[in-house]
C-alpha cells in the first residue's frame, strides 16, 4: 500500500494557528507517516520543534534560512 505525501501550506497564518492546524492534521494521520509543513511565521521556528518534542513526533528536518520555512515531520 502506497503512503500519500502530505504538504501543509500554512503561509500567511500567524501564531497559534500553524500549530493548531498541524495538530489537527497529525491526528488524522497514521504512525510514521510524514508531512511537509510550509510556513512563514517566525514563531514556527520555536513552536514546531517544541510541539514535536512534547507531542512525541519527530522533526526530521527543517529549512529556516529563507521563507517559506519548511519542516519535515514524522508522526510518532
From Swiss-Prot:
InterPro entries in alphabetical order: Sulphur_carrier_TusA, TusA-like, TusA-like_sf
Alphabetized SUPFAM superfamilies for the sequence: SirA-like (SSF64307)
CDD domains: SirA (cd03423)
Protein's GO biological process: tRNA wobble position uridine thiolation
Subcellular localization(s) per the UniProt record: Cytoplasm
Catalytic residues in the record: 15 (cysteine persulfide intermediate)
GO molecular function terms attached to this record: sulfur carrier activity
GO cellular component terms attached to this protein's record: cytoplasm
Pathway field: tRNA modification
Keywords (A to Z) from UniProt: Cytoplasm, tRNA processing
SUBUNIT field: Interacts with IscS.
Family named by the database record: Belongs to the sulfur carrier protein TusA family.
Function text: Sulfur carrier protein involved in sulfur trafficking in the cell. Part of a sulfur-relay system required for 2-thiolation during synthesis of 2-thiouridine of the modified wobble base 5-methylaminomethyl-2-thiouridine (mnm(5)s(2)U) in tRNA. Interacts with IscS and stimulates its cysteine desulfurase activity. Accepts an activated sulfur from IscS, which is then transferred to TusD, and thus determines the direction of sulfur flow from IscS to 2-thiouridine formation. Also appears to be involved in sulfur transfer for the biosynthesis of molybdopterin.
The protein, known as: Sulfur carrier protein TusA
Protein encoded by which gene: tusA
Amino acid at each position: 500500500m502506497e503512503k500519500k505525501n502530505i504538504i501543509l501550506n500554512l503561509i500567511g497564518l500567524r501564531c497559534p494557528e500553524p500549530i493548531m492546524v498541524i495538530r489537527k492534521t497529525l491526528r488524522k494521520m497514521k504512525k510514521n507517516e510524514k508531512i511537509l509543513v510550509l510556513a512563514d511565521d517566525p514563531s514556527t521556528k520555536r513552536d514546531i520543534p517544541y510541539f514535536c518534542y512534547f507531542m512525541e513526533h519527530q522533526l526530521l528536518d527543517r529549512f529556516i534560512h529563507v521563507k517559506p520555512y519548511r519542516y519535515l515531520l514524522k508522526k510518532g
